[in-house]
Amino acid sequence: MIKKLLLILTFLMVSYGKTGEIIFEGTGKADINGYTFNDNSSYKLYRSNGHWKSSTGDFGLHTCMGTVTSDKNGKNGFNVYCKNTSQKDDYFIMKIYRDSEYQESGAGRAIIVEASKNYSHLIGAECSHAVTYLKSSDYFAMQKCKFR
């Protein structure tokens, strides 16, 4: 009986406690254009493309698009979707988002919202996001993601 109980507990711990981690690193060039209004609020479209690699050895190209907003009180928003296509033509789409609290630091959050079959285990993975921009709109970014 004790052996059965230990076997069941071991199975439950492995099944429910198993989480993985993957790290993505990317570089690219961003293009941000839009409007700044008289009250200093703004609405801008964000587009970028570049290259990525993962801690599992995959690599490929990415394209991103979304919005960068600021209201008249200085509250900022960043909501961008990036499609990452691998060397094997598999893909995953990551939503990257930030609010005012993290706007200046380049830190934020991300979540994987869609994926092809080979990346389907990553759907729902939550990630920390960090990006550094150079003066020329080139950037370096990293996401550290946890998944089950």
Identify the function of each model-found stretch.
Residues 4-13:
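Sec-dependent N-terminal signal peptides
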Residues 18-148:
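Beta-strand-enriched cores of mature, soluble protein domains
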